[in-house]
């Protein structure tokens, strides 16, 4: 005797977004946000696995065993609220005022998670393939025990994800006007020059680190990294801090520190930029009696998901729901898509990002419902194209 079909469960995207926002999951805290999501996914028939690395909660949920496996990726952690007194609505109260849902994470990106869950709840369970969710609590922080660790674990287990959608707020001005198909890479460098402190009247008794630091930064900034790359902005280097810790007017400081960031397109690889930074530091230190050190950390490589059948599905789904034709873009900062790209083709699509990370972060309630409709159309078109 066959088991009766499970009762259909319809999930309201706005109500779920509110439930998630009410969990103050400021990175790296979870505060029960994963529990809220897991309960909803289990009600929809998903097999949920909690994957904890360090203190970070992660969730991989899958429904179905066949291919293709379409995955939605996102994060439940949020950035700090700043001055809570400056908010017109409590940052974790998830209040709706004048058709706007307020709260930290409303845009980035709890509402997108809720919209995709709602979309899945309105579709039949016997889709010709599998649906999965890869959700982390470590995207807004150091991002060392989140998506990158889950991806490594899934790859080691032989788990296959065929395509992935990351629900970051990619839309620029109107929902559906932009889809991200790639990102520039990122490398941070911490540069330290240690000299010898002394009196400014007796420079021969000191080793001033500042001229060496100025030379290093001048060398790095004088190079034009490139003029751009097909589909990408030019790479750019920015000095983000310089510090000598010296308030005296008659003292040569003992040390100078600086930090730089490079956002680079596919014309470069992180390892080559790291080698260049280290070499420029060595050259600037030639003849200096002190010590120069550069510590570089590659945050992610540049990547591009080539336009094709997968992006066509997303463009068509946006058109179905909004009548818009989205721009396929690689602008903006990094996201966890940089880790997922090693598993499968990945694109990013979500809400308008105008108020993300801001005081009074908010999203129109109707925009959440419209996003759920787009995701629902996307899922249907995906399995029609790839199953």
Swiss-Prot record:
Note describing how the cofactor binds: Binds 2 Zn(2+) or Co(2+) ions per subunit.
Reactions catalysed, as given in the entry: N-succinyl-(2S,6S)-2,6-diaminopimelate + H2O = (2S,6S)-2,6-diaminopimelate + succinate
Residues involved in Zn(2+) 1 binding: 75, 108, 168
Pathway(s) annotated for this protein in UniProt: Amino-acid biosynthesis; L-lysine biosynthesis via DAP pathway; LL-2,6-diaminopimelate from (S)-tetrahydrodipicolinate (succinylase route): step 3/3
Active site, per annotation: 77, 139
Essential cofactor(s): Zn(2+); Co(2+)
EC number: 3.5.1.18
GO biological process, any: lysine biosynthetic process via diaminopimelate
Keyword Metal-binding: yes
Protein origin, superkingdom: Bacteria
Residues bound to Zn(2+) 2: 108, 140, 357
Keywords: Amino-acid biosynthesis, Cobalt, Diaminopimelate biosynthesis, Hydrolase, Lysine biosynthesis, Metal-binding, Zinc
InterPro entries in the record: Bact_exopeptidase_dim_dom, DapE_proteobac, Peptidase_M20, Peptidase_M20_dimer, Peptidase_M20A
One MF term in the entry's GO annotations: cobalt ion binding
Function: Catalyzes the hydrolysis of N-succinyl-L,L-diaminopimelic acid (SDAP), forming succinate and LL-2,6-diaminopimelate (DAP), an intermediate involved in the bacterial biosynthesis of lysine and meso-diaminopimelic acid, an essential component of bacterial cell walls.
SUBUNIT field: Homodimer.
Family classification: Belongs to the peptidase M20A family. DapE subfamily.
Protein name: Succinyl-diaminopimelate desuccinylase
Organism: Caulobacter sp. (strain K31)
Lineage of the species this protein comes from: Bacteria, Pseudomonadati, Pseudomonadota, Alphaproteobacteria, Caulobacterales
Name of the gene: dapE
């Amino acid at each position: 005797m066959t088991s009766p079909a499970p009762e259909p469960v319809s999930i309201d995207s706005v109500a779920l977004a509110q439930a998630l926002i009410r969990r103050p999951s400021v990175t790296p805290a979870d505060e029960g946000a994963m529990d809220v999501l897991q309960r909803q996914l289990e009600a929809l028939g998903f097999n949920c696995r909690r994957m904890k690395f360090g203190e970070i909660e992660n969730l991989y949920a899958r429904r179905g065993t066949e291919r293709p496996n379409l995955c939605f990726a996102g994060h439940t952690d949020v950035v700090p609220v700043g001055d809570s007194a400056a908010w017109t609505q409590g940052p974790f109260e998830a209040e709706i005022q004048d058709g706007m849902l307020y709260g930290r994470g409303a845009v980035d990106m709890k509402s997108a998670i809720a919209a995709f869950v709602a979309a899945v709840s309105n579709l039949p369970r016997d889709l010709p393939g599998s649906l999965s969710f890869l959700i982390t609590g470590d995207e807004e922080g150091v991002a060392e025990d989140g998506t990158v660790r889950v991806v490594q674990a899934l790859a080691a287990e032989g788990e296959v994800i065929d395509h992935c959608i990351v629900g970051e707020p990619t839309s620029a001005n109107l929902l559906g006007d932009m889809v991200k198909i790639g990102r520039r890479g990122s490398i941070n460098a911490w540069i330290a020059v240690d000299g010898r402190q002394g009196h400014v009247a007796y420079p021969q008794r000191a080793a001033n680190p500042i001229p060496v630091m100025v030379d290093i930064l001048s060398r790095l900034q004088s190079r034009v990294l490139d003029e751009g790359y097909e589909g990408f902005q030019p790479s750019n280097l920015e000095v983000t801090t310089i510090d000598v810790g010296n308030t005296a007017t008659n003292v040569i400081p003992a040390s100078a520190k600086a930090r730089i960031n490079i956002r680079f397109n596919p014309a470069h690889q992180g390892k080559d930029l790291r080698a260049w930074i280290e070499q420029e530091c060595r050259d600037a230190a030639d003849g200096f009696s002190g010590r120069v050190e550069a510590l570089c950390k590659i945050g992610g490589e540049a990547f591009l998901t080539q336009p094709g059948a997968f992006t066509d599905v997303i463009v068509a789904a946006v058109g179905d729901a909004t009548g818009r034709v989205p721009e396929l873009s690689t602008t903006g900062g990094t996201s966890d898509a940089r880790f997922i790209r090693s598993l499968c083709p990945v694109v990013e699509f979500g809400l308008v990002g105008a108020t993300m990370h801001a005081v009074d972060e908010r999203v129109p309630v109707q925009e959440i419902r419209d996003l759920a409709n787009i995701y629902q159309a996307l899922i249907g078109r995906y399995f029609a194209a790839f199953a």
